[in-house]
């Protein structure tokens, strides 16, 4: 505690749903320990969403792109490189305003790690904590690129302590050794996170110690690392946070189709759930192959196809397959993964989705697209052994017959029993990690002690 008041943690996420959700859940965990938590959101996102953050206070600030948010910037790099003085002054003003209202900051949590934010923390007398929302394995690759130990584009296999043998197609950012550029700003942004890391007081990771123990034990980073995941609502894990059944922040409106009632009518472990997240955009050819693969499995399915992607579906697909399949534009993924009827999760292997699949014990079929996804899919199949990764052919997309093979392998094949057994084991470990005395629970308590029982105030 500071000056007899509650310790106050400020959270500054990257303004995207996949980054806000985990840091918001972390904030709820901190609040459950009687800490004040404030998430700093942009005006654009606050105006675009109906948030229900629960015990976390929301404070809005202008990022200079109020009408359109990050997508209104010329590029991702331009957004994150916007003038330091402008961004820093606004955050210092917010910190001073909170301080004047009796809510002095204790810790500033950042994602990613911009230098201006580190300077804000220092000027305001706050601790700074770098919050990483991707797995340690992926950031290990970025760290080696930053240090010059891995040269891009990568053409040879990569062998590093603590990591499985990696081919260029397994590496993060984009496949084929960073060769197929989906977002030209992404690699520099990810790599340059490590530029300012030595200025942070601590690192928080949305991971589980048991998932990446070798890497975490062998970390060469110049600061303490705390694994605080999985950052999934408590209802699905330890149930220690009251009424915490949803993230409380959603840029998309869930489909009104009664998909849970539909699931209730299905047998246990019989339904394929397909979702490629909030950002991935499949080509029309890939969409067609997924559709043909689903038909070929002859199994019930729910497929999330965002409104912007519906035109890519084959003509009459929804109507012709209505007897055994649903197409919805958005849904509550946790509800689907937790349902007893769900037997397989076909996923792009974004880290949040991967962690949800692990935490809820659902076997996975990985169809990675870009960023960290290929490496996450590698771990799903070869390290944690909770699913399989679909192979690509020719035009770099997954054919329908390969999709069918993977689904059948996970749900009915020779390895399906072992995959389900592994999924159940990791599910238990995930729940144990955030339960009283678990690895993540201990890390969260250590984080609180270091941030709040010190004369220096902190910023996450």
Swiss-Prot record:
GO terms, biological process: carotenoid biosynthetic process
Q: Which Pfam families match?
A: UDPGT
Q: List the catalysed reactions.
A: crocetin + UDP-alpha-D-glucose = beta-D-glucosyl crocetin + UDP; beta-D-glucosyl crocetin + UDP-alpha-D-glucose = bis(beta-D-glucosyl) crocetin + UDP; beta-D-gentiobiosyl crocetin + UDP-alpha-D-glucose = beta-D-gentiobiosyl beta-D-glucosyl crocetin + UDP
Q: Which CDD domains match?
A: GT1_Gtf-like (cd03784)
In this chain, UDP-alpha-D-glucose is annotated as bound at 133, 333, 348, 351-353, 356, 372-373
* Record GO terms (molecular function): quercetin 3-O-glucosyltransferase activity; quercetin 7-O-glucosyltransferase activity
Q: In which domain of life is the source organism classified?
A: Eukaryota
Q: Which SUPFAM superfamilies match?
A: UDP-Glycosyltransferase/glycogen phosphorylase (SSF53756)
Q: Which residues bind an anthocyanidin?
A: 19
What is the residue range of the signal peptide feature?
none
User: Which UniProt keywords are given for this protein, alphabetically ordered?
Assistant: Carotenoid biosynthesis, Glycosyltransferase, Transferase
Q: Which InterPro entries match?
A: UDP_glucos_trans, UDP_glycos_trans_CS
> What tissue specificity is annotated for this entry?
Mainly expressed in fully developed stigmas.
E.C. number: 2.4.1.271
Describe the family membership recorded for this protein in Swiss-Prot or TrEMBL: Belongs to the UDP-glycosyltransferase family.
Please describe what this protein does. Crocetin glucosyltransferase involved in the synthesis of crocin, one of the apocarotenoids responsible for the color and bitter taste of saffron.
Query: What PANTHER family is this protein classified in?
Result: GLUCOSYL/GLUCURONOSYL TRANSFERASES (PTHR11926), GLYCOSYLTRANSFERASE (PTHR11926:SF1553)
Protein name in UniProt: Crocetin glucosyltransferase 2
Organism of origin is Crocus sativus
Its organism's taxonomic lineage begins at: Eukaryota, Viridiplantae, Streptophyta, Embryophyta, Tracheophyta
């Amino acid at each position: 505690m500071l000056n007899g008041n509650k310790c106050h943690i400020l959270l500054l996420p990257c303004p995207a749903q996949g980054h806000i959700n985990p840091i918001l859940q972390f904030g709820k965990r901190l609040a459950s320990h009687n800490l004040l938590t404030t998430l700093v959101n942009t005006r654009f996102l606050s105006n675009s969403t109906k948030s229900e953050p629960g015990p976390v206070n929301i404070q809005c600030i202008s990022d200079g792109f109020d009408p359109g948010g990050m997508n209104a910037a010329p590029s991702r790099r331009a957004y994150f490189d916007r003038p330091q003085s402008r961004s820093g002054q606004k955050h210092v003003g917010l910190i001073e305003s909170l301080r004047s209202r009796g809510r002095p900051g204790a810790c500033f949590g950042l994602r990613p790690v911009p230098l201006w934010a580190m300077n804000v923390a220092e000027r305001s007398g706050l601790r700074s904590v770098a919050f990483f929302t991707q797995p340690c394995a992926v950031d290990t690759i970025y760290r080696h690129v930053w240090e010059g130990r891995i040269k891009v584009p990568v053409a040879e296999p990569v062998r590093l302590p603590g990591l499985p043998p990696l081919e260029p197609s397994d590496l993060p950012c984009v496949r084929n050794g960073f060769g197929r550029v989906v977002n030209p700003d992404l690699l520099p942004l990810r790599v340059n996170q490590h530029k300012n890391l030595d200025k942070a007081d601590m690192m928080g990771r949305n991971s589980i110690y048991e998932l990446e123990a070798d890497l975490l034990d062998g970390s060469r980073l110049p600061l303490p690392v705390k694994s605080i995941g999985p950052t999934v609502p408590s209802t699905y894990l330890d149930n220690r946070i009251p009424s915490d059944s949803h993230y409380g922040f959603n840029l998309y409106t869930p489909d009104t189709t009664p998909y849970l009632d539909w699931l209730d009518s299905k047998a246990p472990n019989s339904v394929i759930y397909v979702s490629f997240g909030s950002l991935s955009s499949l080509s029309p050819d890939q969409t067609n192959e997924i559709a043909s693969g689903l038909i070929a499995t002859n199994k019930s399915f729910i497929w999330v196809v965002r409104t912007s992607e519906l035109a890519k579906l084959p003509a009459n697909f929804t109507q012709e397959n209505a007897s055994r399949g649903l197409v919805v534009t958005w849904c509550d993924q946790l509800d689907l993964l937790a349902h007893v009827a769900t037997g397989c999760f076909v996923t792009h292997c974004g880290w949040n989705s991967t962690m949800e699949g692990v935490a809820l014990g659902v076997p996975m079929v990985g169809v990675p697209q870009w960023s960290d996804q290929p490496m996450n899919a590698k771990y799903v199949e070869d390290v944690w052994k909770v699913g399989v990764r679909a192979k690509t052919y020719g035009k770099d997309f997954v054919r329908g017959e390969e999709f069918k093979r993977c689904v059948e392998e996970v749900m009915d094949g020779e390895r399906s029993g072992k995959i389900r057994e592994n999924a159940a084991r990791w599910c238990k470990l995930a729940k144990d990690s955030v339960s009283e005395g678990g690895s993540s629970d201990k890390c969260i308590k250590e984080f609180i002690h270091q941030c709040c029982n010190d004369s220096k105030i902190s910023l996450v």
